[in-house]
Regions:
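Core segments of cupin and vicinal oxygen chelate
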Residues: 2, 9-53
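Short polar/acidic secondary-structure junctions
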Residues: 46, 63-64, 98-99
Length: 124
């Protein structure tokens, strides 16, 4: 058995903007009430009915660090609707929806700071 993904981190220049973007897009519960304003994505508050989901963090890059991107795939009930909502919040659609295998559809976008984010819907 492989090791599961248990955390993700999305870092950018404007942490508050990114935290707001993801809270609005996916209705994530994010708590940045700490000295670093690091937004902890609450795993327990974001689980599916089957207990599926991971927690993570959204924060600001130190000034001396170059930018980058993180790719995570987020399960959504409707890839097209999620891509459209992401675009309405300032994202750039890159791909999709696209069927990759039977019952699996994906989409990819760049968030407002250029992070590559994937969306996935599976028939499981």
């Amino acid at each position: 058995m492989g090791q599961p993904v248990v955390h993700f981190e999305i870092m950018g220049r404007d942490a508050a903007r990114l935290q707001s973007f993801y809270a609005d897009l996916f209705t994530w519960t994010i708590n940045a009430d700490n000295p670093m304003k690091y937004g902890m994505v609450d795993r327990a508050a974001n689980l599916t009915a089957d207990g599926i989901g991971i927690g993570g963090g959204i924060g600001a890059l130190p000034e001396d660090m170059p930018g980058g991107h993180v790719t995570v795939y987020v399960a959504v009930p409707d890839v097209e609707a999620a891509l459209a909502k992401a675009a309405s919040l300032g994202a750039t659609r890159l791909m999709g929806p696209e069927k990759v295998t039977d019952g699996v559809e994906i989409g990819i976008f760049n968030d407002p700071e250029g992070h590559l984010i994937g969306l996935i819907k599976s028939a499981a």
